[in-house]
């Protein structure tokens, strides 16, 4: 069983049939059914923005889908924040949210699944959809 840290791009694509990466995200999460899928708390916030704009029913649907997919929400603590800051300082092209996901993959010894091919230059753990 693998450990996977999921970037927001994967989950946004999964929930958005019109997204260019939708089919890849659905296929990847189906293959991950027996894996430990980890979502950083900051990623949870990112993927809930649109449902909150739509309304409470949309939020409930996304949260139910995450539960059905057995997603584990991982907190952002001081150690993770420091590692993300270090990554952001040395890789200025990535955003802080992206650095948090990459830092979590390192911290948890997990694969990092994303739609961002550029992340492959930052960590050997990155797997692009």
Question: Which residues does each PLM region occupy?
Answer:
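Short, well-structured N-terminal submotif of metal-dependent ribonuclease cores
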Residues: 1-39, 51-64, 117
């Amino acid at each position: 069983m693998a450990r996977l840290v999921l970037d927001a791009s994967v989950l946004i694509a999964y929930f958005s049939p019109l997204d260019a990466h939708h089919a890849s995200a659905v296929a990847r999460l189906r293959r991950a059914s027996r894996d430990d899928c980890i979502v950083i708390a900051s990623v949870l916030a990112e993927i809930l923005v649109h449902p909150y704009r739509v309304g409470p029913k949309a939020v409930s649907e996304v949260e139910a889908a995450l539960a059905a997919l057995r997603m584990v929400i991982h907190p952002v603590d001081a150690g993770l924040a420091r590692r993300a800051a270090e990554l952001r300082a040395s890789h200025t092209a990535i955003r802080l949210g992206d650095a948090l996901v990459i830092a979590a993959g390192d911290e948890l010894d997990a694969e990092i699944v994303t739609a961002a091919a550029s992340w492959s230059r930052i960590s050997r753990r990155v797997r692009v959809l």
